[in-house]
């Protein structure tokens, strides 16, 4: 019927109730594929022309792609090999996105240093390195610069993490989104990329000081697992 479950709707009218179930034979299926591997990391498992709606909440494909790459490297994987795959931290979204960011020429010496760092980066998210921190802060600020004025603050805040494929599509196909509606000048995509870098670097400097060489991703990228009951005891 109406809607797809991605937004709140009046549940008492019946207009948005499910109309039925997907036939079992039409459910996505992969059985003993020729490649010998099955990979999923919450990424899309059906094509765009699949007739039934499953969800809008697919993960971006990068983890799925990377796991597939690693599994295809050798025919058999011992236990320690699977441990290495689980611990792999190559960022395929950085592989895709960094060249796009670096197309915008640096506008000051600090930006030039960052361009040099990211241009030589191997895209591994190592805790001891500055590059992962700079990259993540940059794309976070870039998404804000591209979308916050268009979507409004409330809707923008619903974007939990940077959406790299969406940003790449905007930069490639919808440059009108690069203009900041809150200013009197018409910004280009290069302007927004450069501005977002400055804001990212300023933000990191407030956290870790002005010395770029001393910055570390691991000091900001922390996973805290709190006990739901006893953490406050």
Identify the function of each model-found stretch:
Residues 7, 38, 86-233:
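Acidic, low-complexity N-terminal propeptides/linkers enriched in Ser/Thr/Asp/Gly that mediate export
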């Amino acid at each position: 019927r109406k809607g797809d479950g991605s937004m709140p709707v009046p549940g008492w009218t019946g207009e948005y109730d499910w109309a039925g179930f997907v036939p079992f034979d039409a459910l996505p299926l992969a059985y003993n594929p020729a490649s010998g591997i099955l990979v999923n990391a919450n990424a899309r498992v059906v094509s765009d022309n699949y007739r039934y709606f499953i969800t809008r909440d697919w993960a971006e494909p990068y983890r799925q792609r990377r796991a597939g790459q690693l599994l295809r490297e050798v025919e058999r994987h011992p236990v320690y090999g699977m441990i290495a795959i689980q611990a792999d931290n190559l960022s395929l979204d950085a592989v895709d996105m960094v060249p796009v960011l670096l197309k915008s020429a640096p506008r000051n010496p600090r930006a030039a240093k960052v361009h040099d760092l990211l241009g030589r980066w191997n895209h591994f998210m190592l805790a001891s390195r500055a590059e992962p921190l700079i990259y993540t802060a940059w794309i976070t600020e870039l998404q804000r610069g591209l979308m916050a004025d268009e979507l409004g603050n409330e809707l923008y805040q619903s974007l939990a993490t940077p959406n790299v494929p969406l940003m790449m599509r905007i930069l490639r196909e919808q440059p009108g989104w690069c203009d900041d509606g809150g200013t009197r000048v018409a910004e280009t995509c290069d302007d927004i990329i450069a501005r977002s870098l400055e804001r990212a670097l300023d933000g990191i400097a407030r956290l870790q000081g002005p010395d770029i060489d001393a910055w570390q991703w691991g000091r900001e990228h922390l996973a805290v697992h709190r006990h739901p009951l006893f953490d406050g005891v």
